[in-house]
UniProtKB/Swiss-Prot annotation:
TPR repeats lie at residues 58-91. The keyword Zinc-finger does not apply. The gene is Lrp2bp. It is found in: Cytoplasm. May act as an adapter that regulates LRP2 function. Pfam families: Sel1. This is LRP2-binding protein. It comes from the Eukaryota. Sel1-like repeats lie at residues 92-124, 132-167, 172-205, 206-241, 242-276, 296-331. One of its GO terms (cellular component) is cytoplasm. Interacts with LRP2. InterPro entries: LRP2-binding, Sel1-like, TPR-like_helical_dom_sf, TPR_rpt.
Length: 346
């Protein structure tokens, strides 16, 4: 399973201080709302930061690099962060992410790990808001065995540190991944999985909200509670959790709500597997693996409804198309569902 990096944590003190000192740009946005379009705003922001750099504003260097990063101009971002790494710990953090993930450069996991360790081992007060996120990323490296020797034990230790007992100001991503980790490891520890998904969900994590719905639905790590399950799943689905959407499709099918199943599943099944999965992952911060799994589930059940004419006019040619799509998206899940179909359990 491929995990994703923790996004750069915000430093509310430095950013708010910067905003308080530099009112020109923010006033410009208010005075010219018709000009507030993305391309224009980016260009103006770059000009603004260039002027701040000319006047000796040290923070403007990092903000320019971060703007490059957020726009996907990774080579420019990398060059900017390399230039200021000796003076800016946030640049060191971003270099760790970029080298590990191969953004703007050839992937070098060992170098990425080195940057993250530098953050975690630093005693500088300016690194405090970065430590939990760096620990999550190091845990990811140990879990994936990239840049370091693979170790689930070390990954777990680092994630527990990063999760900080459910602290909302720590790494909420680590809290969510611990929920996933305890539900996957052998032997499973579903009570711990439920605990960590609960903590992450309470701190706003969308992936864990869907996972909680699934655990309530099947009584995993907690007493079965269909009402609580549907509450979590529907809210997660509305917020864009595609796996939660897939679970709801399955629930509607099993409850014989075929019209609802068809209308809900078609929209999900028609997502573009090449372009939509990365986009949804970026927007929701959900793992691509579970996004594709939700799409596969929706595609399979939509195909079944088309095949049998449940809630929709029978169309076997279209059914074959969606069965094939489910197999492409997640062969293992499609095989499991096909086995249930053969045994007439679907």
């Amino acid at each position: 399973m491929k995990l994703t990096s923790e996004k750069l944590p915000k430093n509310p003190f430095s950013l708010s201080q910067y905003a308080a000192k530099q009112q020109t740009f923010f006033q410009w946005k208010k005075e010219k709302p018709d000009y507030y379009r993305h391309a224009n705003l980016v260009d103006t922001a770059l000009q603004f930061l260039k002027e701040r750099i000319r006047k000796g504003d040290a923070m403007a260097y990092f903000l320019r690099g971060q703007l490059y990063f957020e726009e996907g101009w990774y080579e420019e971002a990398l060059a900017q962060f390399e230039e200021i790494q000796e003076k800016d710990h946030q640049a060191i953090y971003q270099l760790g992410v970029m080298y590990y993930d191969g953004l703007g450069t050839v992937a070098d996991a060992e170098k990425g790990v080195g940057y993250m360790k530098k953050i975690l081992d630093s005693s500088c007060p300016q690194t405090m808001h970065l430590k939990f996120a760096a620990a999550y990323n190091l845990g990811r490296a140990y879990f994936e065995g990239k840049g370091v020797k693979r170790s689930d034990e070390e990954a777990e230790r680092l994630w527990l540190y990063a999760a900080d007992n459910g602290n909302p100001k720590a790494s909420v991503k680590a809290q969510s991944i611990l929920g996933l980790f305890y539900s996957m490891k052998e032997p499973k520890d579903l009570e711990k999985a439920f605990f960590w998904h609960s903590e992450a969900c309470g701190n706003g994590n969308l992936e864990s909200q869907g996972a909680l719905g699934l655990m309530y639905l099947y009584g995993q790590g907690i007493r079965q509670d269909t009402d609580a399950a549907l509450h979590c799943l529907r809210e997660a689905a509305e917020r864009g959790n595609v796996y939660a959407q897939g679970i709801l499709v399955e629930y509607y099918y099993k409850m014989k709500f075929f019209t609802k199943c068809v209308s809900f599943s078609k929209r999900i099944a028609d997502y573009d597997e090449v372009h939509d999965i990365p986009m949804i992952a970026h927007v929701t911060d959900c793992l691509p693996e579970f996004i594709s799994k939700g799409m596969a589930m929706a595609s399979f059940y939509y195909a079944r409804c088309l095949q049998l004419g449940l809630g929709i006019t029978k169309d076997e040619a279209s059914a074959k198309h969606y069965y094939s799509k489910a197999c492409r998206l997640n062969p293992t899940l499609a095989d499991e569902l096909h086995s249930l179909l053969i045994h007439q359990r679907i």
